[in-house]
Amino acid sequence: GDFTFTGLAIHEVRFNKMPVVGNDFYPLDEPQPDEVVPDPSLENTEFAIAIKGIFHGWDASLYGAYFFNDDSYYDPLGYEYTLVDVIPLPGGGVQPIYEQDFVALRRHARLSMVGGAANVTSGSWLFKTELAYTDGYKYTNTEDEKAQWKWLVGLEYLGLKNTTVSLDLLQTWLDDFEPSMMNLPDFAVETQFETALRISRTFLHERLELVFFGLLRGGEGEDGAFERLSATYDFTDRFTAGIGALFYQDGDSITYDNIHDNNRVYLDLTYSF
């Protein structure tokens, strides 16, 4: 078979941006602590490698990475006291009243990940599986680091003209789980099962694409779900227009419980220079 080796180094670390306080998708009732972003340096550089082999009817990959977690944890610094009132006491003197605030910084843990993947084709079917082990997770409500396993199995069907149907099942396990990790601000769960379904079809000589994507968290959607419908049309090689709708359902997950009323209709215009 043919083998390829890929290496990657990211010198400048960038994390996903949280919605601002008051946004419909902001999950908390109060502002988060300040975030610590690692300075660009050799010590903070993220690395990833992958080895892929392609054989007759199937392929396999091994990969590893050393990177920062996009999700942050709170590093507590203590408490800050602010004088908010003074109460006069009988016989003289006063009683100060202080407001206590928890002070912390948001930091990102350094993670180590190893994994593998395999894909097998049979006629119009593609079968795929992935397994990954990641160590180094840190949480606010526990002191020791945690490890996580992720296992994905999926299939794609390409037997219909201009149509692709894919179904993926993902199971996540968190080792050495502690009940305190379920509390604010971690909201961690010991196991999480997810199902993703994507159906796409092209029309008009592949200039128009219709896509349905649905994600179900939990075996019966008890942790929330969402669906996305979209249509994209290529007017020219440079100009593309799209329209779509997003629908959310709540569940036991605080994220979906907070956003289940945030259904959206959107328009996307893209011009490439």
Regions found by a protein language model. Give the residues of each.
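Detector for outer-membrane/organellar transmembrane beta-barrel domains
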Residues: N119-L216
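Structural signature of outer-membrane beta-barrel channels/translocons
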Residues: G1-D2, K52-H56, N119-G123, E156-L158, ...
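Repeated loop/turn-to-beta-strand initiation elements of outer-membrane beta-barrel proteins
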Residues: D2-G7, G57-A60, S124-K128, N162-S166, ...
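Membrane-embedded beta-strand positions in outer-membrane beta-barrel channels/transporters
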Residues: E46-A50, M113-G115, K150-G154, A196-R198, ...
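Outer-membrane beta-barrel translocator domains and adjoining extracellular loop/strand segments
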Residues: M18-D24, Y73-Y81, Y139-Q148, D176-L184, ...
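Transmembrane beta-strands of outer-membrane beta-barrel pores
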Residues: A9-F15, F55-G57, Y66-D70, S122-S124, ...
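Outer-membrane beta-barrel "beta-signal"
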Residues: H260-F273
